Structures are given as structure tokens and as C-alpha cells.
Amino acid sequence: MNKKSIRNVNLKGKRVFDRV
């Protein structure tokens, strides 16, 4: 939801932020 969430996902290398 927040920009922090997208950064956390980037660390794992997932594409969850793609849904945002």
C-alpha cells in the first residue's frame, strides 16, 4: 500500500508491487 511496502518487496525480489 505505502512506498515502504514496495521497498520491502524489492528486497525479496518479488513482483507484488506490480499489483499496486
Swiss-Prot record:
Region (Disordered): 1-20
Regulation: induction: By heat shock.
GO molecular function annotations of the record: ATP binding; phosphoglycerate kinase activity
Subcellular location, principal: cytoplasm
Reaction(s) the record says it catalyses: (2R)-3-phosphoglycerate + ATP = (2R)-3-phospho-glyceroyl phosphate + ADP
Domain of life of the source: Bacteria
Localization in the cell: Cytoplasm
Gene Ontology terms: biological process: glycolytic process
Protein name: Phosphoglycerate kinase
Lineage: Bacteria, Bacillati, Bacillota, Bacilli, Bacillales
